[in-house]
Design a protein with these regions (language model features):
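Transmembrane helix-bundle core of multi-pass membrane transporters
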Residues: 58-124, 151-154, 173-182, 259-286
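Transmembrane alpha-helical segments in multi-pass inner-membrane proteins
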Residues: 163, 174-239
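Hydrophobic alpha-helical transmembrane segments
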Residues: 9-13, 30-38, 60-63, 108-113, ...
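Helix-loop-helix "hairpin" substructures at the membrane interface of multi-pass membrane proteins
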Residues: 27-36, 41-47, 51, 100-178, ...
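Single transmembrane alpha-helix segments in multi-pass membrane proteins
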Residues: 1-25, 49-56, 191-194, 198-208, ...
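Interfacial loop-to-helix junctions that mark the boundaries of transmembrane helices
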Residues: 25-31, 96-108, 178-185, 227-237
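Cytosolic-side transmembrane-helix boundaries in multi-pass membrane proteins
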Residues: 143-150, 221-287
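Hydrophobic core segments of alpha-helical transmembrane domains in multi-pass membrane transport
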Residues: 66, 70-71, 110-121, 156-167, ...
Length: 287
């Protein structure tokens, strides 16, 4: 499995582009959203091709992306904050992103819709089964006829597209984007939510429902830190402890499962070895 470390920096870069297109250049917001998604798609495609065609390590590719996108966002704005003009209103866009219906934020509905689509894609489609197979063992998946290069590239494209959508929501929520800090450590939040939701860092295991619950649990942990009066500066320490605990639990679970499989296999062999053999029939008895 691979981890995309460029998520936070990509949110900053795409957020700056979106805010400037809508607020500075007057581009209609549906067009701006489409452009941001296209840019995100191209960035994800670049990640996938570098990993599959040039055989670069996902960690190296996405780490370089983290640095490049953050630097590009800061260079584009000249370290200035990108924001919407004072008093500017975008009723339809604001209703879609930060509005509420029946007291429920529309971002929650967006999360549910995206979660359902991703659940179907991962658990009820051929691509999802191929993705899990590649995550467990890329070589075995390749030998079984799966187009591993396509699957890996598609995974990074999907990740980048979802990051582009998140960039729009975050930009509308904050109303401004500070390129040096916007989206900082968001990739760690994503990793922590996935680990809490039962995803294996080894790849090939996990569920969409689990990662949604993991994201909810992570937010509740942050709220608990605030309620307990723990300084907000320790949020990252709590997050690191959560990730560490999740990794340790994942390793222990994998060891337990391996021992259980070995015990079952040994039991099957023992039963076969102890099966009664049919006594040979004497020729005289047949006569």
């Amino acid at each position: 499995g691979g981890i995309d470390l460029s998520v936070g920096s990509m949110i900053a870069l795409l957020g700056v582009i979106f805010v400037d297109m809508v607020g500075k250049f007057g581009v209609p917001w549906p067009v701006a959203i489409l452009v941001v998604i296209v840019i995100g798609t191209l960035l994800g495609l670049a990640h996938g091709l570098l990993i599959t065609k040039l055989r670069m390590q996902p960690f190296v590719v996405t780490l370089c992306g983290l640095l490049i996108y953050r630097g590009a966002a800061r260079g584009y704005t000249g370290e200035a904050t990108a924001g919407f003009p004072f008093g500017a209103n975008y009723p339809a866009l604001e209703w879609l992103t930060i509005g509420r219906s029946l007291g429920v934020p529309h971002s929650f509905f967006a999360m549910i819709i995206i979660g359902i689509v991703c659940w179907f894609l991962l658990h009820r489609s051929v691509f999802g089964r191929h993705l899990q197979a590649v995550g467990k063992n890329e070589d075995a998946a390749r030998y079984s006829g799966i187009r591993t290069g396509f699957v890996i590239t598609a995974a990074y494209v999907i990740c980048a597209v979802l990051t582009a959508v998140a960039a729009v929501y975050f930009a509308m929520f904050t109303r401004s984007v500070q390129p040096s800090s916007h989206g900082n450590f968001y990739e760690l939040y994503a990793i922590a939510a996935a680990v809490l939701g039962g995803f294996s860092l080894r790849g090939g295991e996990g569920s969409i429902i689990g990662v949604v619950l993991g994201a909810v649990l992570l937010q509740e942990l942050q709220n608990l830190v605030n309620l307990l009066g723990i300084p907000s500066s320790l949020n990252f320490a709590v997050m690191g402890a959560v990730i560490l605990a999740g990794v340790l639990a994942d390793q222990q679970f994998n060891r337990y499962r391996a021992k259980r499989r070995a015990a079952i296999a040994l039991g099957v062999l023992n039963r076969k070895g102890s099966a009664p053999r049919q006594a040979p029939v004497a020729i005289d008895e047949i006569r």
